[in-house]
Amino acid sequence: MVFSVAKKDTTPYEGQKPGTSGLRKKVTVFQQPHYLANFVQSTFNALPAEEVKGATIVVSGDGRYFSKDAVQIIAKMAAANGVRRVWVGQGSLLSTPAVSAIIRERIAADGSKATGGFILTASHNPGGPTEDFGIKYNMGNGGPAPESVTDKIFSNTKTISEYLIAEDLPDVDISVIGVTTFTGPEGPFDVDVFDSATEYVKLMKTIFDFESIKKLLASPKFSFCFDGMHGVAGAYAKRIFVDELGASESSLLNCVPKEDFGGGHPDPNLTYAKELVDRMGLGKTSNVEPPEFGAAADGDADRNMILGKRFFVTPSDSVAIIAANAVQSIPYFASGLKGVARSMPTSAALDVVAKNLNLKFFEVPTGWKFFGNLMDAGMCSVCGEESFGTGSDHIREKDGIWAVLAWLSILAYKNKDNLGGDKLVTVENIVLQHWGIYGRHYYTRYDYENVDAEAAKELMANLVKMQSSLSDVNKLIKEIQPNVADVVSADEFEYTDPVDGSVSKHQGIRYLFGDGSRLVFRLSGTGSVGATIRIYIEQYEKDSSKTGRESSDALSPLVDVALKLSKIQELTGRSAPTVIT
């Protein structure tokens, strides 16, 4: 059978602007007639012709509700637009880091390589018929489309009048591995359904010393727990942690991917990963002895949370500790780090490591594509952000399972001569040792979700206006908390990319204090309704005798300053944040 190409008339939808992580909306929005098709055609039209005609693209995601329908629609549109091959992870499941790896690494049996891919995910947002869906396009380097491309996509969505689709192309059974070939007006079109985990596992084995991690996991003194939060990480967890590294299956929690993430919010933090938090002894008291090490990943497995026994590692500390230990612990970095980078709201723990180890250091806006540019230019090896994203230049996305393996590698290295000893070096030991050398950045983030957009704008505008007179700001701060250090500089963060010279403005409001502490205020665009205000509060403590305080006590004066300075309750009516991290 030869499929035919149909031109379908359509009209633009408002608001199809892809943010730092693509287009995210409620499923019901994506189910509107032509809504997904408009965005997909606008993307094809924004790409160079050679990345569409005769090209190979990946289409898969975190398995959330509507993914299976979306794969079939995109495959039919790809065929109609002259794409030669579509690669699909079995069951439409591929983690975001795995898509990046597959675009960069996979060579199919016929020798083809991918030029890009559609990732179907709304990351850590909930899934289900009334929840969120998302789509983003990644380029040939495996990283998210840069602003030059996403701006073009958005512009196309505003003027689109028709799209191409092979309506008579039958649906492909994506649960079965194999290549299905169709014939169209321009020749053959293949849909290649392949195993979701194989390529990614192969890549991880080139980065980490699996044998040393295996020895750690085999030690009777070491216990391990991983929570997949019913996201796509489950497709990798059994393969890596159980089959390759020898962990017991009982150490895996919620590792069956589900379209609605089991009704949960697949965001690996202390609020939403409740089951893991309790098991690790950080929740309600339990008589069961917690494991030595616990970790979780989010819906599309690009975020991670690291826990020790009754101990939480902040993401800002996590990236700093990985960078400080990478060269000794991880074979991939044995010849040294090219540089390190963090997003602006992430604590300055990484800056201190970079300074001490004489590493190139970069502070970038929120959004993984900024790290990608540095990596493509060979300027950065390890990077991270406070929102539970950590990664390296092995791919161009953050990578939850990579971060877990990095921590297991550090633990394996620290315990290599100690596996038969009385006591293992623990996660907590490693963090305390790090603070002893580099000082501690007490850190918290307050999220106010679904705030009225106008109120949020007014709050941010006030904070910018106040920056014109720091003496007034300091006077106000002294009235709120007399012992807090003075603000020495304040600005709206702006970034000039050292690679391509592009400028990103309005990236968050910063108040920097004389003792190295910071307050940062940002409006976030990753939710699908309302605005989210994020307040980042960071208190630096150099004195190693004072690094063991309760975080909430150490931060209390600065929290008070942040809430009163921003007038958040007055302007938004919110007396407390939705989430505290």
Swiss-Prot record:
Family annotation (InterPro entries): A-D-PHexomutase_a/b/a-I, A-D-PHexomutase_a/b/a-I/II/III, A-D-PHexomutase_a/b/a-II, A-D-PHexomutase_a/b/a-III, A-D-PHexomutase_C_sf, A-D-PHexomutase_CS, Alpha-D-phosphohexomutase_SF, PGM
A single Gene Ontology CC term: cytosol
Residues the record lists as binding alpha-D-glucose 1,6-bisphosphate: 24, 123, 302-303, 366, 385, 387, 398
Disordered, as annotated region: 1-20
Gene Ontology biological-process entries: glucose metabolic process
Enzyme Commission no: 5.4.2.2
Biased composition annotated in UniProt, kind: Basic and acidic residues: 1-11
Record-listed Mg(2+) binding positions: 123, 298, 300, 302
GO MF annotation, one: magnesium ion binding
Cofactor note: Binds 1 Mg(2+) ion per subunit.
Entry-linked CDD domains: PGM1
PROSITE patterns for this protein: PGM_PMM
Residue positions where Phosphoserine is found in the record: 123
Residue positions of the active site: 123
One Pfam family in the UniProt entry: PGM1_C_vert_fung
Keywords: Carbohydrate metabolism, Cytoplasm, Glucose metabolism, Isomerase, Magnesium, Metal-binding, Phosphoprotein
Entry's localization field: Cytoplasm
Quaternary structure, from the entry: Monomer.
Sequence similarity: Belongs to the phosphohexose mutase family.
Main function: Catalyzes the reversible isomerization of alpha-D-glucose 1-phosphate to alpha-D-glucose 6-phosphate. The mechanism proceeds via the intermediate compound alpha-D-glucose 1,6-bisphosphate. This enzyme participates in both the breakdown and synthesis of glucose.
Protein name per Swiss-Prot or TrEMBL: Phosphoglucomutase, cytoplasmic
GN (gene name): PGM1
